[in-house]
Every structure is written in C-alpha cells, then in structure tokens.
Amino acid sequence: SSISNSYSNIEIKARTAILQDFLSGEILYEKDPDIKIYPASMTKIMTSIIAFDLIKSGDLSLDDKFIVSEKAWRLSTAGYSSMFIMVGDEISVEDLLHGIITASGNDACVALAEGIAGTEEEFAILMTAKAKELGMENTNFANSSGINDPDNYSTVRDILKMSRYLIQKHPDFYEWFSLLEFTWDRTGGDPITQGNRNPLLYKNMGADGIKTGYLAVEKYSLASSLIRNGRRLIAVGSGFETKNSRSRESSKLLTYGLTNFDLVEINKSSETIDKVDVWLGKENQVDVYVNEDIFKTIKKAKKNLLKVALKYEGPR
C-alpha cells in the first residue's frame, strides 16, 4: 500500500526514488518508481541472493571452492571495482561473497556465477527467474555484476522488492552488508583490504546496508536500509548526479521516513481480537485472531485519528 505523496514536504534530487516502511509495507515516498533504470552494482544483491538460496537449501556450501577463469580475471584488470583475483585461483564461496558484497568485485561475481551455473549467461537466467518469482515485473538480468548492458535493467520498485526478500529470508547473511571492510588473503600476494562503498554505513544513523551502484549512463544509485528502535526503512534511488548527492539525498529520504511517520502495531498474531458466535458447533463461541502481526504506518500528525474496527461477515 502507499501513502500519498501529497503529504510529502520533501524533494529528493534523484531521477527516481522510493521509500518503504519494512514492517507495514507502506510506501512513504515515491518519485517515478517504475521508470527503467540500469541497476549497476545493485545487481549484486540478486547475485548474492542466488547463492544464499542455494546455501539455505543445502545445494551450496560457504566452503565450496571455485576456480577463477580468464573471463573473471579480466574484469579485475579493466578498471572496474574488483576483488583482484587471479586466473587459476581456488576461492571459497564465502570469500567470493564478501568480495561481492563489501568490495563490490565484478570479478568475484563472474567467478561465483560460473562456479554455480557453468557460465555467467546461465547464471543470469537464474537471476531473472528469481526476479519474476519475487514479482519484479520490470526487471531483466543479463550479467552478474551490473556492468553496462542494455538488457540488464530494472526499476527502483523492483530493487526494493529484491531488497525486502534479502532482509526477510536471509537475515544472517544480510549482516554481511554492514561490514565496513574485507581483507582478501590471496595466494601468492599480500593481503588486500578494501572498505565498503556504502557511504551511509559511516554515518551515525543506524544504516546497515545495502548496495551502491554507478554507471555513466545512469549516474549514481543506492539501495539503502536502516534500523532504529526496531523499526526498519528501505530506500532505493537512482540517477543521483554525484557521490555526495547520493549520500546526502539517501540520508534525507530515510530521515524523512523516521521523523514524519510512526509505525503502529495494530495487533499481534498471538492476541485474541474478539469472539464470534458459532452456529451448531461444539462450542458456542470461538476466538478470532490474525495469522500475522499487523502494522500500520501513519503520518505523525494524523496518529490520533487512527481507528481499528473488526467486521465479521459470518461463515463462508
């Protein structure tokens, strides 16, 4: 559901952006959220998800090792963000994932993709299939890293759906997205330490993810999330003009959600809401409850106007 932007007293300097309250699912802000974007390194969220799903199902282990191909190595020499792996290196899935998540290594993406699916092209098919499963209706993946390709596209709304899935289904692995650095103890060379590229992690605001992106055709992008006092917000923006504006505007958007809206717990799944009469049953009444916690996000100025009602329409 969406809270109308007519409330909004904020303008985000991005080509497209969206903000969601995680628990309620309410959209608190949107700006052209369904226009096509080139997701750049935000693509790596899906690359990671494919691996996490396989690990969760028992079909892949963090200790499994993949051999680096020449194709993967070439990406480390082409000026892209890299883990700096070498042809023939045997690298664990765990190290490759850290190289993808923290160092944003395009070379690590290809090594992981080839190790899982045989070729990067086959891996991209898995990525697109997963996107469709998640309801990412305007997304297609053509590679594992997000390097420029007209067939590698998405929307900020779809990136939001992907980010929600990551946080919901893989909370333990999601913690890796908040790590500030990763050291690659490579064979036959000095260790390489790289810092996380997400600027919000270095601010004292509760940010714990997710992934930056940059392409010349798209400018700067960021999928970000913070959690404060148990409340999580997710923001996705693309088309920021500079690195500084990406950091500033993303911070502004998340802060807007925190300061202008409250998250209200309507009902816990374990709590009885009411009792209803039973016709010709063993009991005269049964308890009524919901099967999941219900949350509502509401503008702070309208919080006192919130009313909850139960409507019982009888047995079906």
Region locations from a protein language model:
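Domain-terminus/edge residues, biased toward the C-terminal soluble/receptor-binding domains
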Residues: 136-137, 148-153, 157-316
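Active-site-adjacent loops and short helices of periplasmic peptidoglycan-processing enzymes
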Residues: 2-171
